[in-house]
Each structure stands twice: as C-alpha cells, then as structure tokens.
Amino acid sequence: MTFGRGCGEPRVTARKLRSSVLVLLAVGLVAGCSIALPPPRQPISAEARRAIDLLITRWQSVTDLRTLADINVERGGQHQRLTGVLLAKAPGSVRFEALSPFGQPFLIAVVHEGRLTAFSAATNEATVGDATAETTARLLSLPLEPRDLVAVVSGYAAPPDDLRMGEILPADALGPSLSLVGAVHEQRIWMDFQSGVVRQLQIIGGRAAATVTYRRDDEGRLTGFDVSAGERYVTGTVRYRNLTTGVGLSAKHFALALPKDAKTQPIR
C-alpha cells in the first residue's frame, strides 16, 4: 500500500485526523470523559441473566465483516463526510480506510492485538497506543474496549466481562431494556428478549453518553446505524453498502506497517 499524498488528495491536519477517527469509530464523540471507580457487584435476577446469556450467545457467533461505509457527522454545526472500507473481526480487531475521491486511502485507523493506530497518509503522521478503555477515552472521548468497537459496528452488544450489575428496566417508548454495569461504563440495551436482536444501545461513561440506533432492512439485515452524543451536540449516520459477513479475515488484514519516516506520537 502506498501512503504518499496523491495529486488533489485532501490534506488532513492533526485536528482533522482526530476528528475523523472520532467519526469512524462511531461512538467516541464527546470530550471530557473520565473513568469512574468500578461499582460493587450486585445480585442479578434470573430474568436478567437469561437476557445476558442470550446476548453472549449472539456475540459469540460473530466472526467478521467487510463493508463499504458512508459516514456523515455533524459536530457543533460542522459537517464531515467520509466513505471508506470497514473491516471488523471478533473479538477485537477493526480497520477503517477512508478513501479520497480518487480511491486512495488518506486516513487509516486500526485496532488490533490490543493496539490503536491512526495514520494520516496526507501528513505522514500517526497516533499510536494501547487499545484500552483509558486510551480510547483519551483519544475518542469514550471508554470502549476493542470488543465493544467490534460489537457496535457489527450490530451487536457485548456484555461486559467484568459485569457488576444487571437488571431489566421498565418499558419506555422503545420497550423494555437491559441495564448492564461493568467496571468501566454502563450499557443500556433495547432488544428483542426472545431473539436477542439489539435495536438500540446506549453507552454511558463518565460525563458522556452516546446512543447507537441500529438500522436493519425488512429482512432484519444490518444496514448501518445512527449515533448521537453530547445531548445531540454530535449526531451521525453510518450506512453500509455490500455488507458481507464470515469472509474469513485474518490477522494480516489488520496489520499496518507505517512508513519508516512517519511521525508518530503516543496517545495522551
């Protein structure tokens, strides 16, 4: 893959690089997020446990996906559009290549093997660090482990490994929901309690909250999702084209060898 800037290819500044990474990972959209101390564990009812087990079973069925993604975001009155190739592989690998009008990648972001790398081909700059809840909170402003990223782009919800609390909440306009509190953040999941299909996911971490609403066609196939955060200071849509699952992606599809002269900086 060639990382040089082509003729007419848009220049991506450090600010735009960070903004684009916010877009492609869909849920890191609000600044000022902090990670609270884990809450104490609480007993979980049998009904809630059945719902959790259903989510786990569906999550464990996820393999990989490949799709073209059209991303539109409005942030503080500013609009941004990206189109690119999105790859995801369970349990925790995601790659997005934003394409220029000429079809060349100008921004590449990869979460793989516990590392987070965002590279701008236009400026030859990269931001790298461990892909943990803390580092994604610093870069993406919301604490998301790699498995949560894969779950979101795949249309699922992955219950926290370190589950502290779980309860079924009374129905609202969207129906009943499941509240799951882990060591890092809280998830509220609106789902079909018979099939386990997730309709909407709210992720609450620190002072930030993001809501992901999945879009599916008449046959139930995932077509993308909408996202809002910061009391709708940020809103966005992600629409998939030619989505394929079970394509047999391997680790090589998520390898990103930076140019030797690339400027790198750690996630702060």
Predicted features by range, described:
Residues 1-33:
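Sec-dependent bacterial lipoprotein signal peptides
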Residues 33-81, 260-268:
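N-terminal leader/targeting segments and the immediate start of mature chains
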Residues 57-65, 77-80, 87-92, 109, ...:
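Edge/loop elements at the starts and ends of beta-strands within beta-rich repeat scaffolds
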Residues 70-76, 101-104, 119, 185-187, ...:
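Hydrophobic lipid-interacting interfaces of membrane-associated proteins
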Residues 92-148:
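An acidic-aromatic
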Residues 151-156:
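Scaffold/interface architecture of coatomer-like assemblies
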Residues 165-268:
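Gly/Pro-enriched, hydrophobic low-complexity segments
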